[in-house]
């Protein structure tokens, strides 16, 4: 049985951020320097009968824009992932909405686990 625990998903701070030109797609090019800080969410992944995403801890009830759910929805829509029947528990320690990149860090950490577990289809 798979049990991956104590995955640390670190926060970051922008040491500087310069907004450059606006692109044709409406976004802006930026120049930035980031630094990882010693503050992290902790992620645990265990086998389950279906995909479950559970948030615990600091401000967990305030999560309205679930990046991890968006990730799995996109991967399934694009048919890029095999069945993923796991429970993902995220213990939130990074303050939500503080600009510390907690949600993005959580997604990046989970993508790395998916690669290690060979969950992606060969297409």
Q: What is the role of each PLM region?
A:
Residues 1-98, 115-122:
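ATP-binding N-lobe of GHMP and related small-molecule kinases
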Residues 100-102:
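Flexible lysine-rich "adenylation lid" loop at the C-terminal edge of ANL adenylation domains
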Residues 104-118:
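Short, small-residue alpha-helix embedded
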């Amino acid at each position: 049985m798979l049990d991956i625990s104590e995955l640390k998903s670190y926060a970051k701070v922008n040491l500087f951020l310069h907004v450059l030109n606006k692109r044709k797609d409406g976004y802006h090019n930026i120049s930035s320097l980031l630094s990882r800080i010693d503050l992290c969410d902790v992620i645990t992944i265990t086998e389950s009968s279906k995909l479950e995403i559970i948030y615990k801890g600091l401000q967990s009830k305030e999560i309205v824009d679930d990046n991890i759910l968006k990730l799995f929805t996109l991967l399934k829509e694009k048919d890029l992932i095999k069945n993923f029947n796991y429970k993902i528990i995220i213990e939130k320690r990074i303050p939500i909405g503080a600009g510390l990149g907690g949600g993005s860090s959580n997604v990046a950490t989970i993508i790395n686990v998916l690669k290690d577990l060979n969950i992606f289809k060969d297409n």
